[in-house]
């Protein structure tokens, strides 16, 4: 059981790293984009993905009662912070 938990936590953090890497590139693209419609389409798709991902992660955290819960909550919080940063960048882009 311990090995399963360690592997699951490692996989969770690998997913977090991949999502953060994707978020960084998405934020750069939206910041550098001149086409607000394309940026908004990307934003809406990403917002939906983040909402679904956080919902799934929080449901998983409710079912798991061990050290994995902390890893899941960390992933959810980081996704929320990136989501808020993406919202701010989209608002800046629309203001231009």
Curated annotation (Swiss-Prot):
Q: Name one GO cellular component term.
A: endoplasmic reticulum
Cell compartment(s), UniProt: Membrane
Is Membrane there in the keyword field? yes
UniProt keywords (A-Z) are: Membrane, Transmembrane, Transmembrane helix
Q: Does the keyword Membrane apply?
A: yes
> Any idea what this protein is called?
Uncharacterized protein C1687.08
Q: What is its main location?
A: membrane
The membrane topology noted for this protein in its Swiss-Prot or TrEMBL record is:
Multi-pass membrane protein
The membrane spanning regions, by residue number, are: 2-22, 38-58, 68-88
Q: Organism, per UniProt?
A: Schizosaccharomyces pombe (strain 972 / ATCC 24843)
Look up the domain of life of the source: Eukaryota
């Amino acid at each position: 059981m311990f090995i399963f938990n360690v592997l699951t936590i490692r996989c969770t953090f690998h997913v977090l790293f991949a999502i953060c890497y994707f978020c960084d590139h998405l934020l750069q693209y939206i910041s550098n984009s001149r086409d607000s419609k394309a940026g908004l389409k990307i934003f809406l798709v990403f917002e939906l993905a983040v909402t679904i991902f956080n919902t799934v992660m929080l449901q998983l955290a409710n079912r798991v009662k061990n050290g994995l819960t902390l890893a899941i909550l960390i992933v959810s919080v980081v996704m929320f912070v990136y989501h808020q940063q993406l919202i701010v960048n989209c608002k800046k882009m629309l203001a231009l």
